Amino acid sequence: MTAVSGDQTTSGSYDVRALQEKWQARWAKENPFTASEDPADPRPRRYVLDMFPYPSGDLHMGHAEAFAIGDVIARYHFARGENVLHPIGWDSFGLPAENAAIKHNFHPAEWTYTNIETQAESFRRYAISLDWSRRLHTSDPEYYRWNQWFFLRFFERGLAYRKDGLVNWCPKDQTVLANEQVIQGKCERCGTEVERRALNQWYFKITDYAQRLLDDMEQLEGKWPERVLTMQRNWIGRSEGADVQFTIEGREEPVTVFTTRPDTLYGATFFVVAPDSPLADELCAPEQREAFEAYRTQVSKLSDIERQSTEREKTGVFLGRYAINPVNGERIPVWAADYVLADYGHGAIMAVPAHDQRDLDFARKFNLPVRVVVDTGEPDPAETGIATPGEGTLINSGPLNGLSKSEAIPRIIEILTERGTGKAAVNYRLRDWLVSRQRFWGTPIPIIHCPECGEVPVPDEELPVRLPDLRGAALAPKGVSPLAAATDWVNVSCPRCGGPAKRDTDTMDTFVDSSWYFLRYCSPNLDTAPFDQEKVAKWGPIDQYVGGVEHAILHLLYSRFFTKVLYDMGMVPFTEPFVRLLNQGQVINQGKAMSKSLGNGVDLGQEIDRYGVDAVRLTMVFAGPPEEDIDWADVSPGASVKFLNRAYRVMAEAAAASAPGVDPATGDLALRRMTHQTLAKVTEAVEAQRFNVAIARIMELVTAARRAIDSGPGAADPAVREAAEVIAITLGLFAPYVAEEGWEMLGHTGSVSVGTWREPDPALLVQESVTCVVQVASKVRDKLQVSPDISAEELERLALASEKVQNHIAGREIRRIVVREPKLVNIVVA
């Protein structure tokens, strides 16, 4: 059998659709997955969370995989009798809804909430064990009110601020993007080439937490995927070195540069500033102004990725000024060059071409001097064009001559400190989180701009600042927020002086919404605070978080930052939000990501109609380790259907042939051993998140039970009933519909997924014998049944005593005997 046909599977084993409808109705009525807040409830608490979906349409294959995996984990803890919080909500602000509203002339809420209801119905059909009483939507005023409340608390603490600066601008979506939302120079949402613009924007000061974000990763080691931790470490980008002050001729204040190689300071032969920085504009001499302006215009068309590419020919312009090297007094030219970025370090660098390839490429292009100050034993970079950044002995460096790098760095920092021209410093690649957006469908920033009072927070009692009713063409991007055109909404009285003022017309990055939603689930209907701190202390932090690796830097980093701020505010008792993280792979098709352009998309609804929910879920989880991609062209939902029918028949026949309550100890011992070993192995595999291995063990038990029914003690044997019950319990993690039906057929009430897990009998886990393979010249000649505790000496003796083995070694010289007790003996002969 390969598919669901009409109302029944083609084998006629059970009516898949009727069974799904029956149990959906039962779960909706009984709500078996609602978490208890009863303080007297003795059950251990467990918080399992899937990254909440964006309502862009119905659920797709990626949702199906992620939520199937998360549901296995949640159902396992439900089955173990724990008090599990497994909630659902929607990340419902964002550009897709706004773009749809512009295209079809309606309000974004119409599209958003219609899609939410579609997805909610699909979640119910897909049998996810959710606590529906805690459902939330981030686009509800009752939710985004607290985004605004947090913004004001951040503002009070100096963590929310506004500044002028160069920002990433998406010309298609007409809004700014955080650095994390620019992927290889393009908008991560629409793929448009990103531009750089000078704008006044709101930021969250995540850089204040850079070191703590790094240090606290120790809590996550071994519990988060190492690649996610590596990605975050690289994004934060801690560098140790020195801040060095260069005097600029004609400028009173020195310019500070950060370098990780202060030991090479004697090799600095020119000075480079970012062409789009205010410093470059200031330093440009009048006679170079025209050339500089032309160059700056040229650079403005390049993305940061292009500017830092090692493949591009270096470009730049001399600014007509000179800097003074603080260690040797040398006069070095000041250039503007696109490979230096305004927002890294101080927007300026000392160029040491002998030991940095980008500096060397630039020096060779513009005939600037190259001075070797570290003897690495390699050829002169000025001749080869290959810089030598490695270790060596300092030369041409005055008091540093003869020192190694590790000796020279602290010495030069000491010299700079004594002279007042430098100091040890730490720099981070991480930049503050740009949180303002020039779009409508998001949380309004709760600030009022008063010509007399400046930036004035909206009073807490006036929150939420609700979005005005704009729709269709009024939402079209114009380079400023659509809210700016809502004059009745914009024009207000200043809360401080009462004079005329204007609301801030930007909305918040929707990653603000998802940076704390997991806390709101603990008390989703609370209207006096963002969350009940006592309940958060009981439920948090989240024990298991499940979602895609694409969120490694954005959502996960921001959530970690938010949690640390809330910890400092005394609102949560933990500093990390997610104890364990599982990143599932992608569902691809024919070796490629699914896309309309490739025509390789797979419709989840059609797959469910064809095979049934249980088969689709089982296939998703059985395809391989959860972190690996699933190629839907390579898996077989039809095979899952066949297996589920075999499991169903075992449960049905055991239920029909035997009565509950009979002591299974009176049943077939071999099957009982298999049943309890399966329990132990499934438990171990699920806890290790090797879900495909757990399913394989269940399949083996179904086969053993089938064999016992057909050619063993028969379906009436108590051991068969015990096996059938364990099949129902363990299969309930992966295929809840057929498992619930089997559990009920076997005479049980209540959900198979709640409090039913069994502990294996240790006595039945002890193997009385194992099979030992005996090889002669690497060919199998006999198989022996031996004790699992047999010694190597005894096993060798038994192997040599075997008549079959004797027939193959008679008259031959035995070179050596390899024993791997208790399962292998290999006799090597001449």
From Swiss-Prot:
A motif ('KMSKS' region) lies at residues 593-597. Keywords: Aminoacyl-tRNA synthetase, ATP-binding, Cytoplasm, Ligase, Nucleotide-binding, Protein biosynthesis. Its main location: cytoplasm. The keyword Isomerase does not apply. A motif ('HIGH' region) lies at residues 53-63. Residues 379-399 are annotated as: Disordered. Pfam families: Anticodon_1, tRNA-synt_1, tRNA-synt_1_2, tRNA-synt_1g. InterPro entries: aa-tRNA-synth_I_CS, aa-tRNA-synth_Ia, Leu-tRNA-ligase, Leu_tRNA-synth_edit, M/V/L/I-tRNA-synth_anticd-bd, Methionyl/Leucyl_tRNA_Synth, Rossmann-like_a/b/a_fold, tRNAsynth_Ia_anticodon-bd. Belongs to the class-I aminoacyl-tRNA synthetase family. This is Leucine--tRNA ligase. It comes from Thermobifida fusca (strain YX).
